[in-house]
């Protein structure tokens, strides 16, 4: 997804990122984070490793876990379970098993075959029942117009899709905007966001 390799990550760490932070005061936290982002372009995997290490050090400095540094902590985190792509009846059985294990949110991969996707989602919805959430991940497979058409079909069939993840190619920010403005299904960007700058661009 990122295009990074293990060698490239190690190189970015040794040649740029570690040299940028070694010997500096972790209490100067905001400047450290900015320096990490400025010292080399891209290389988001290596930057993420340093970012996490700096937050951990900052928490140790003030004897606080990182979740308390961020604020808004919670004792329970809701996650989903991905139902592997298979025949609709197999996916329905997998969904029933997931529900029995306590999952309230089901994730389904879509994008390769619209008719089969609808059959799979229908089976998953019937197995999950009306009270549980179903979210889908198209993995950049659709064009903007195709995404709107298919999402509208899903809504018309009463599938109750909670959100769609990355419906269009990662670079197509205008396409994400197009889908967001024309579909009732909320759009989640995934591969489109690899940096704080990407996040700002998405929000704009």
Segments predicted by a language model, with ranges:
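Metal- or metallocofactor-binding catalytic centers and their adjacent structured scaffolds
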Residues: 1-61
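Flexible, glycine/charged-enriched surface loops at secondary-structure junctions
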Residues: 27-29, 66-69, 161-167
């Amino acid at each position: 997804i990122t295009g990074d390799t293990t060698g490239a990550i190690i190189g970015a760490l040794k040649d740029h990122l570690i040299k940028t932070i070694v010997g500096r005061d972790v209490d100067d936290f905001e400047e450290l984070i900015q320096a990490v982002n400025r010292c080399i372009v891209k290389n988001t995997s290596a930057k993420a490793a340093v970012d996490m290490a700096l937050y951990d050090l900052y928490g140790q400095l003030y004897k606080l876990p990182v979740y308390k540094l961020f604020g808004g902590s919670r004792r329970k985190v809701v996650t989903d379970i991905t139902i592997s792509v298979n025949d609709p009846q197999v996916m329905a059985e997998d969904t029933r098993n997931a529900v029995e294990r306590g999952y309230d949110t089901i994730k389904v991969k879509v994008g390769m075959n619209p008719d089969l996707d609808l059959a799979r989602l229908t089976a998953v919805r019937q197995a999950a029942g009306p009270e549980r959430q179903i979210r889908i991940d198209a993995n950049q497979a659709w064009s903007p117009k195709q995404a709107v058409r298919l999402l509208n079909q899903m809504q018309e069939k009463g599938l109750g899709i909670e959100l769609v993840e990355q419906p269009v190619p990662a670079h197509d920010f205008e396409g994400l905007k197009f889908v967001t403005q024309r579909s009732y299904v909320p759009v989640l960007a995934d591969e489109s966001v690899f940096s704080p700058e990407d996040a700002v661009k998405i929000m704009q």
